[in-house]
Amino acid sequence: MAGSLTASNRRRNAEDSSEIYRWTIGFARFVHYPSSPSPHPVLKPLGKREQYHSPHGTWLSASSSTVSLHIVDELNRSDVILSVKLGQKVLEEHYISKLNFTWPQMSCVSGFPSRGSRAIFVTYMDSANQIQKFALRFSTCDAALEFVEALKEKIKGLKEASTQNQKNKTRCDVSFQSDYNPSDAIIPRATQKEPNMVRPLNSYVPEMLPRIVYEAQYQKSETRSEVSFQSDYNPSIEIFPRATEEEPNMVRFFDSSVPEVLPRPEYEAGQALYPSQSTLNQIPSLPPSFTTLLSGCFPDSTLDAGQTTVKQNPDLKSQILKYMEDSSFQDMLQKVERIIDEIGGNWIT
């Protein structure tokens, strides 16, 4: 039969393991007219009315106390089977998920709610994409209502089971994805990144910490406005060996005018070294007032190779000692030492 179940051989097992709903009904089936006349001489050909007017078919009914309607769950409860039997002969057998049900409503008295009729129409599409129809007529309206309620309950159970199966499938997929660890895959060595790779010394770019940069810029601007003296400054000597090799985050100031001074014990001993006049002329970063002060305090030194010492003026010594004993110079010196300590004071030793 077109549209019948392909799992008819499992019907008996399903009936043994599931709850069965049963009703005594009247049954009718719609039979389509053939598309072409039959060549058999016994069959009477169709007239023009049947060929060219609706419904292009006829209803065949069976009204007997032996016709029964059954609703039974599938063995694995994936669907529900609806079957119509004439005695032990199966007339219709379908999954309810493949069927469309129509229940006409009627009202005998105006003002009262409508009630469903005793007849229910069922349609489905067969393998040839042709719509097939049959009708179920119950003995009472209450019996029809009971069938509809049972049908709704079964359909609701199918929807809940489908939703639960979908959730279980989703959980299974999520569990599989969580168990999968892409880091276990073998990555070619050429594609691996080695951020800790030692780079050549000449290609190293020091990294400045935000806090040190901010404090150093603030101290640099404050020191430029207060510094008025510099001792033993030689820009040709770069004293940054440890900052280059051991402390990559050490901050360097190549364009800063912060003076570099000797350790405090040398000032207390009164020892001071002074650069030559030619060296002072090569320092463009010093303030004009500071350069003028040093140029006026030191005598010109000769450029002869044999003459390496500069004669010291006693008045100049007393003037330097006077500057060293001044409170403003001591405050400036303490600020410079504090800056050196904050950016790493051990590199000057």
From Swiss-Prot:
Protein's cellular compartments: Cytoplasm
Keywords in alphabetical order: Cytoplasm, Meiosis
GO biological process, one term: homologous chromosome pairing at meiosis
Superkingdom of origin organism: Eukaryota
One GO CC term, this protein: cytoplasm
Transmembrane residue ranges: none
Gene disruption phenotype: Sterility. Chromosome paring defects during meiosis.
Role, per record: Required for accurate chromosome segregation in meiosis. Required for pairing to occur between homologous chromosomes. Acts in early recombination steps and ensures pairing fidelity and proper repair of meiotic DNA double-strand-breaks. Regulates recombination and pairing of homologous chromosomes during meiotic prophase by controlling transport of RAD50 from cytoplasm to the nucleus. May affect pairing of the gene-rich fraction of the genome rather than preventing pairing between repetitive DNA elements.
Annotated protein name in UniProt: Protein POOR HOMOLOGOUS SYNAPSIS 1
Lineage: Eukaryota, Viridiplantae, Streptophyta, Embryophyta, Tracheophyta
